UniProtKB/Swiss-Prot annotation:
Protein name: Co-chaperonin GroES
Chief location bin: cytoplasm
Protein's gene: groES
GO MF entry, a single one: protein folding chaperone
Locations listed in the record: Cytoplasm
Subunit-level organization: Heptamer of 7 subunits arranged in a ring. Interacts with the chaperonin GroEL.
Its job: Together with the chaperonin GroEL, plays an essential role in assisting protein folding. The GroEL-GroES system forms a nano-cage that allows encapsulation of the non-native substrate proteins and provides a physical environment optimized to promote and accelerate protein folding. GroES binds to the apical surface of the GroEL ring, thereby capping the opening of the GroEL channel.
GO CC terms, sorted: cytoplasm
InterPro entries membership: Chaperonin_GroES, Chaperonin_GroES_sf, Chaprnonin_Cpn10_CS, GroES-like_sf
Keywords: Chaperone, Cytoplasm
Gene3D superfamilies reported for this sequence: GroES chaperonin
SUPFAM superfamilies (alphabetical): GroES-like
Amino acid sequence: MKLRPLHDRVVIRRSEEESKTAGGIVLPGSAAEKPNRGEIVAVGTGRVLDNGEVRALAVKVGDKVVFGPYSGSNTVKVDGEDLLVMAENEILAVIEG
């Protein structure tokens, strides 16, 4: 199954959780924080402006992005994988390089 977001929404595959702290302590799955970064796997067609024009999104498939800890509260399971669906304005930055 393929997920196609509408308008200014994006679908993000969350990065793997960190299982160790910087000090080397191994965290159980329940104690590890969910990462606030991921890779865009699908984008919508764009935001519809008041005048009817469609503004294309500033992000594209394959971009690595950072989002807030409470962003992407819409989790969808597709082919056994949890994906986040969020509006483009919930993305804080694109990771370059």
